[in-house]
Amino acid sequence: MPVLHNRISNDALKAKMLAESEPRITISFYKYFHIADPKATRDALYQLFTALDVFGRVYLAHEGINAQISVPASNVETFRAQLYAFDPALEGLRLNIALDDDGKSFWVLRMKVRDRIVSDGIDDPHFDASNVGEYLQAAEVNAMLDDPDALFIDMRNHYEYEVGHFENALEIPADTFREQLPKAVEMMQAHKDKKIVMYCTGGIRCEKASAWMKHNGFNKVWHIEGGIIEYARKAREQGLPVRFIGKNFVFDERMGERISDEIIAHCHQCGAPCDSHTNCKNDGCHLLFIQCPVCAEKYKGCCSEICCEESALPPEEQRRRRAGRENSNKIFNKSRGRLNTTLGIPDPTE
């Protein structure tokens, strides 16, 4: 029986990936379709992906698959062919190719079975996730942006919206997708006569959100096919104005794809224009925040003077402090007043 999970340390895997000479392509895809046996499907896909030297993060559930991966450039077409042949539901599936890619997005393959491929918190048995809004292509998106009767709803988290969004798009203030869904319905109650356009990074969240809005009585609902990634790619290919402003946050080592030259966010420490996310270098914190180069040098990559001081302590003392600290993984985010319980890059499906 082949080993169906990784047994090598993260540090060793990352060093191996960085030493590779062959370029890699970062790809994301999702598909809502019924998987009768997610565990068996997971194991079969794990072997397929491993044979093609694919890295990344893949979730499977009875409702479908959600993947963000890195594929050696020479294996991309083989990967595409084998994925399409794996299940009839995956034939012709759109693969979102990263826009701003250094090929160093992932260094390990993690494939998990979950209850949902997106944590939505929906327990309504009458909800039909297949009853989605209409797709919008790039030219149609631009036309909608000029339509005074249309409202664009950003179905991403605050830290994503902060560094980039469509012109005049509304933010749904929440830290997780499951919190956003009821808030979106509540915020839009007075606008049921409007055209609601929903979007996210690659399409998976806004597709489900469009179905949720329709379930709650909204009839004029659209969502952007392929999300921000596919919109920007098609707009550029077709010579259309790209109406997304700033950077598209992505959930891998890159932490962002530059879409436009505008920098709309600010350093959380000094307020200078900046849209570069980082994780606090203090191993007892790892808060995701925006930090400019000046503050990165001043605070040694940490989010505060306290974390800077703690990260300079001997490793044993740092471990002792972390072990004795209650709720050590709940770090207050001064920029938003929220608790961050994630160490490292956030999970896009939460």
Curated annotation (Swiss-Prot):
Top-level taxon of origin: Bacteria
Pfam families: Rhodanese (PF00581), Rhodanese_C (PF12368), UPF0176_N (PF17773)
Enzyme Commission code: 1.14.-.-
InterPro entries linked: Rhodanese-like_dom (IPR001763), Rhodanese-like_dom_sf (IPR036873), Rhodanese_C (IPR022111), TrhO (IPR020936), TRHO_N (IPR040503)
Annotated ranges, domain Rhodanese: 146-240
Keywords per UniProt: Oxidoreductase, tRNA processing
Keyword Oxidoreductase included in the entry's annotation: yes
Annotated catalysed reactions: uridine(34) in tRNA + AH2 + O2 = 5-hydroxyuridine(34) in tRNA + A + H2O
Family that this chain belongs to: Belongs to the TrhO family.
The protein, known as: tRNA uridine(34) hydroxylase
Organism: Escherichia coli O127:H6 (strain E2348/69 / EPEC)
Lineage: Bacteria, Pseudomonadati, Pseudomonadota, Gammaproteobacteria, Enterobacterales
